From Swiss-Prot:
Catalysed reaction, written as an equation: Na(+)(in) + 2 H(+)(out) = Na(+)(out) + 2 H(+)(in)
Role, per record: Na(+)/H(+) antiporter that extrudes sodium in exchange for external protons.
NCBIfam families: NhaA
Transmembrane intervals: 32-52, 78-98, 114-134, 142-162, 173-193, 200-220, 227-249, 306-326, 342-362, 376-396, 411-431
Compartments where located: Cell membrane
Record region (Na(+)/H(+) antiporter NhaA): 1-428
Occurrences of domain Thioredoxin (ranges): 429-623
Renumbered residue ranges of the record's region Disordered: 626-652
Protein source organism: Salinispora tropica (strain ATCC BAA-916 / DSM 44818 / JCM 13857 / NBRC 105044 / CNB-440)
Protein name, as recorded: Na(+)/H(+) antiporter NhaA 3
Gene transcribed to yield this protein: nhaA3
Keyword Signal attributed: no
Family: In the N-terminal section; belongs to the NhaA Na(+)/H(+) (TC 2.A.33) antiporter family.
GO CC field: plasma membrane
Pfam families: Na_H_antiport_1, Thioredoxin_4
Amino acid sequence: MTGEIPRGRRWSARTTRASRLNSPLRAFLHTETGSARVLLAAAVVALAWVNLDESSYESLWGAVFSVRLGSWQVSHDLRFWVNSGLMTFFFLVIGLEVRRDFDLGELRERRRLMLPLLAGIGGILAPIAIYLAFNAGKPTAVGWGVVMATDTALALGMLAVLGPRFSDRLRNFLLTVAVVDDLIVIVVLAIAYPEHPSPMALFVAAGIFALVLLIRAAGVRWGPGYLLLGVAAWLAVSESGVDPVVVGLVMGLFTYAYVPARTELQRAADRFRLFREQPSPQLARSVRAGLASALSPNDRLQHIYHPWASYLIVPLFALANVGVVVDRELLARAATSPVTLGVLFAYVVGKPAGIVIASMLVPRLSHNQFRAPVGWAAIIGVGTVSGIGFTIALLIATHALHGPALDEAKVGILVATVGASLTTWLVFRLAARLAPARRARALLGASEGIIDLMVPVDPDRDHVRGPREAPVTVVEYADFECPYCGQAEPAVRELLVDYTSVRYVWRHLPLTDVHPYAQMAAEAAEAAAEQGAFWEMHDLLLAHQDELRPADLLRYAERLDLDLDRFREHLADRRGAGRIAQDVDAADLSSVSGTPTFFVNGRRHHGPYNIEALSAAVMSAFASARLRPEGGREPDHRSEAGSEQPDEEPGT
């Protein structure tokens, strides 16, 4: 059941209830390039500030702030509260994202963790070896921990700026490698650089973490309770001499992620209807609790803390720590300093070498049981961008080194950040010069991704728009009354005009608990499909989402010149209900609970459904399709603007 999309024609109109929710500011805040720019700006401000007025810089960050409760108090300077207090929330966000990948992403197949894990370890050992080669036998050898870490936030931002446009696999690989680094770094901070170690306080912290696991296993979902336990763990770890940022990472890894269940969403909708009929404080609390319980704790916490961590906390950290007085004396000393040279070569050479060598050896030694999720160019790119240690390297440097050695390490970290960024740009620039098929293999590799769509597309059964056979298939579970489906519709249409080798599949998922006319509209579309006009009816229904009553449906059928008696009979007998129920069952199998939900070549699409995001997912799928024997041909993705094309569209 296929229909062709008119070529050479763009839809500029929006459905009645559709509106563009994106603004330039919102788009900026939802990109990693935005946070990377803010971070770099903060670093520049710190360098300018300390070189113009060092006394005011140091007096601010050295100011002591205390928290007192009776006779008990905690006193630290402002730099500590940023480095070990606010940065706990940054590590919380990192832990949340890794846990989400464990629960819903590629790492839910645990075997896929092995190679990034070993690559991360390789990316730690090689830099340490290079740093120690420069500093062996010197007091500065104690700073070997400085070269271990990757600044996850800045590395991801630089990858978004310098890397290929369609880099989800690349991003996930980098994230896993970087988090392995962060976990090991935290262990090293605890063991190698403790301040006034207290085993008893560490034992108390371990007990608190165990309590968190117990109450989570018991199904307790009271957020303030977890917050109090997190604060208690932070205080205990701080008293133990270990950097308390570890608490954020551990709590993030403890916070599970899941797709909202449709039953939970329906229950929340039922509570809202009760509140609508009889508003009261008790029902208001019930509605809030129902809405919160439908979403995973991981999603809720990421939504709260990710913007703060990216746009406030990490830039504040850079502002507090990057400041170093750069003068001729320091530069002359750094040019020959084993600390500076050790840090520079460890990050620019050691990081990529360790990651690349480990990624090459693991598949060979495991007889391809553990394969890289990306290609060789992407592995090299991940290696080079992992050489951006920046904020995390500065964090360790403040623990490991002091005095002139600390300033020399900061110079090395800053120069290494620039060097790693330049080599990353060069790697992806060279990869971009490869022929398309070779470039796809170099960036994506040959490993298969996880398929999320449980019921495969059947062109004889499904409603297909575009070519019957295509290298890329976009499946949408949608609801004709859903306003968000209306917002997605213009993007889908533009996608099909831009990429003529894509086939688009509509599957019904009427959310009858919130959209009273969605089921009837879906059945009307099936009634039109019986007469060869599914897509014409589909377009009318989405264009008039506020007009889906029975009389409206009959008016649309008349406008399409359908046999009205046959159309009425189809609706009266509810002949399309069984077909719609099959789509709903298929949605349940794929853990689809809301609309619109998109799948691109079987992979669930996470994120916005605007034309930019969908185009990125489609182009990534095209690149992967080229690696398969049946997808080796180069598709004509883009139609030429202004070409003569028919104005009318065949039916189903």
